[in-house]
């Protein structure tokens, strides 16, 4: 086994002193999303993952939603573009893509092991409506997703970064929501789930005052599981440990 050479999306490229930095780059430097990237993958599996990522990659530069759908392999019949941030082992992403072949799906993560498992699921299920990116989520939003393109965003069980000094690493932050909001169409769904009570409260504290999102839970703040909800191995472990799964459902104004 060899140590997996993981990408380092949080490292901004050097810029010559005196050179202007565009707005997207400046925003990416101010706020970085984090994921735990440690792990080992043997060379054979790594080669397969890299080949799979190359085949299913989402290149940057789509000018608008139509161009994005073209890059995703969709057509005029494509109904929705759904993004999952942090898909883990790909249970939800693969299942939803199989259920809805008319839709286009994008998965973002930084775990190579998870990509390997998801790629196997896609191959076994003959699922072709998924594109994948192994990169920092904020960077993907700024560089690869045109404005008003996403019909749904799923963030299930993001790393809670439980130590207070690490709270700044949590993905749900005001600046992240500021970057996400313009990428979503009006009426698009943002669904989140966590098994850590403190993080659930943190999510609510950041989403409730945000002017771009409206809580759909009644009476709230937490929602019932969405109709499409798929129980994952990660969820089962949390429940077995005695933790409560809390769901949030917001719509983009």
From Swiss-Prot:
UniProt feature, compositional bias: Basic residues: 27-39
Residues the record lists as binding S-adenosyl-L-methionine: 84, 109, 136, 159
Pfam families reported for this sequence: Methyltransf_4 (PF02390)
Its EC number(s): 2.1.1.33
Reaction equations catalysed: guanosine(46) in tRNA + S-adenosyl-L-methionine = N(7)-methylguanosine(46) in tRNA + S-adenosyl-L-homocysteine
Keyword DNA damage in annotation: no
Keyword Transport: no
InterPro entries: SAM-dependent_MTases_sf (IPR029063), tRNA_(Gua-N-7)_MeTrfase_Trmb (IPR003358), tRNA_methyltr_TrmB_bact (IPR055361)
MF terms in GO: tRNA (guanine(46)-N7)-methyltransferase activity
GO cellular component, one term: tRNA methyltransferase complex
Name of the top EC class for this enzyme: transferase
Associated pathway: tRNA modification; N(7)-methylguanine-tRNA biosynthesis
Ranges of biased composition (kind: Pro residues): 1-12
This protein's UniProt keywords: Methyltransferase, S-adenosyl-L-methionine, Transferase, tRNA processing
Region of interest called Disordered, as start-end residue ranges on this chain: 1-39
Sequence intervals crossing the membrane: none
Function: Catalyzes the formation of N(7)-methylguanine at position 46 (m7G46) in tRNA.
UniProt record similarity statement: Belongs to the class I-like SAM-binding methyltransferase superfamily. TrmB family.
Protein name according to UniProt: tRNA (guanine-N(7)-)-methyltransferase
UniProt organism field: Magnetococcus marinus (strain ATCC BAA-1437 / JCM 17883 / MC-1)
């Amino acid at each position: 086994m060899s140590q997996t050479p993981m990408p380092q999306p949080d490292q901004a490229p050097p810029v010559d002193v005196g050179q202007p930095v565009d707005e997207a780059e400046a925003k990416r430097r101010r706020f970085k999303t984090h994921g735990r990237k440690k792990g080992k993958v043997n060379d054979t599996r790594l080669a397969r993952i890299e080949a799979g990522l190359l085949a299913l990659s989402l290149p940057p530069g789509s000018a608008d939603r139509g161009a994005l759908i073209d890059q995703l392999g969709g057509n005029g019949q494509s109904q929705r573009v759904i993004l999952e941030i942090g898909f883990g082992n790909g249970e939800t992403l693969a299942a939803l893509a199989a259920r809805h072949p008319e839709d286009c799906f994008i998965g973002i993560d930084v775990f190579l092991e998870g990509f390997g498992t998801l790629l196997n699921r896609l191959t076994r299920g003959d699922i072709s409506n998924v594109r994948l990116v192994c990169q920092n989520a904020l960077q993907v939003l700024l560089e690869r997703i045109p404005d008003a393109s996403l019909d749904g965003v799923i963030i299930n069980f993001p790393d809670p970064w439980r130590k207070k000094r690490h709270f700044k690493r949590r993905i749900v932050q005001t600046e992240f929501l500021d970057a996400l909001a313009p990428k979503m169409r009006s009426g698009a769904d943002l669904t989140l789930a966590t098994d850590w009570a403190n993080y659930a409260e943190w999510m609510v504290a950041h989403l409730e005052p945000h002017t771009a999102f409206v809580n759909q839970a009644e009476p709230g703040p937490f929602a019932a599981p969405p109709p499409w909800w798929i129980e994952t191995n990660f969820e089962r472990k949390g429940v077995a440990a005695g933790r409560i799964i809390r769901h949030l459902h917001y719509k983009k104004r």
